[in-house]
Amino acid sequence: MALLQLLLFAMLAACGFSEEQTEGITIAYKVLEVYPQSRRVLITCDAPEASQPITYSLLASRGILVAKKVVHDSVPASFNINITIKSSPDLLTYSCQATSNSGTYGPSSRLQMYQELWAKPVSQLQADFVLRHGDSGPTVELSCLASSGSPPITYRLVGNGGRVLAQQRPLHGKPANFSLPLSQTTGWFQCEAENDVGVDSSARIPLPRAEARAKLVTTLAGELPLTPTCILAGSLVSIAVIASRMLSSTGL
Ligand SMILES: *[C@@H]1O[C@H](CO)[C@@H](O)[C@H](O)[C@H]1NC(C)=O
Ligand SMILES: *[C@@H]1O[C@H](CO)[C@@H](O)[C@H](O)[C@H]1NC(C)=O
């Protein structure tokens, strides 16, 4: 796994600088070195229209000044910085600013570096579900969460035949929550989680067959005692247990 990540970093680094420009100033970066707990990163700022000498400032998120450099020729300013893995990815936002006799340039667009620094494939996707009695009939409520994965994960609810029924992109570390009316689906469903560097699927969860469902609907209309519902809910729970066992035995 560590090897795979290193390979990824190497590939991304080999792709060269990613560059963005606003208001006459560009910001770009390159990962120079990967250490177990930190990354050495080269950030370059370039304001090609500014007259020399140019004073470049590298700003972190919320406008905090990280470093300043005065450049006397037409080369971009380079900042060599160490980033520890402990920092929260969303705090690692940088921008450049430049001042010279010809004026002020920037701030540049904000650079977010988490992808190359923290890229991690999706792994150990868990799908948990409960049966609820909604207004429009019985509903399966499904919660999907991968134990790791960065950049952010898009979760999809996939139904019979691979059809995507819904998708969500929750905040980092939060589960996606789907609600699936039993009347609108047949066969099975599953969760799928994907980010820029990988994809993972939960085990398929079979839905109860039509006759069991018809009984359930009648039950929920209040014409029968609640027992069949409990049996159905019970069988769904046991399916969940089996599904999660299957998951943990195939998990990475
Ligand atoms: C960055 O971190 C590495 C390893 O932690 C260290 O060897 C290197 O000297 C540091 N560089 C700077 C510029 O602080
Ligand atoms: C799903 O539910 C959990 C727990 O209630 C919550 O923390 C999470 O933010 C929800 N996800 C979405 C995408 O709303």
Swiss-Prot record:
Induction: Up-regulated in the mammary gland upon the onset of lactation. Up-regulated in peripheral blood lymphocyte B cells upon activation.
InterPro entries (UniProt xref): Ig-like_dom_sf (IPR036179), Ig-like_fold (IPR013783), IL-40-like_Ig (IPR040878)
Record carries keyword Glycoprotein: yes
The entry's keywords: Adaptive immunity, Cytokine, Glycoprotein, Immunity, Secreted, Signal
Glycosylation sites: N82, N177
Keyword Secreted: yes
Cellular-component GO terms for this entry: extracellular space
Cystine bridges: none
Recorded superkingdom: Eukaryota
Observed effect of gene inactivation: Mice are viable and reproduce normally. Show reduced number of both peripheral lymphocyte B cells in the spleen and precursor and mature lymphocyte B cells in the bone marrow. Show smaller and fewer Peyer's patches, lower numbers of immunoglobulin/IgA-secreting B cells and an altered gut microbiome. Exhibit reduced levels of immunoglobulin/IgA in the serum, gut, feces, and lactating mammary gland.
A molecular function (GO) term: cytokine activity
Family matches, as Pfam families: Ig_C17orf99
Gene3D superfamilies from the UniProt entry: Immunoglobulins
Coiled-coil region(s): none
Signal sequence, start to end: 1-18
Name assigned to this protein: Protein IL-40
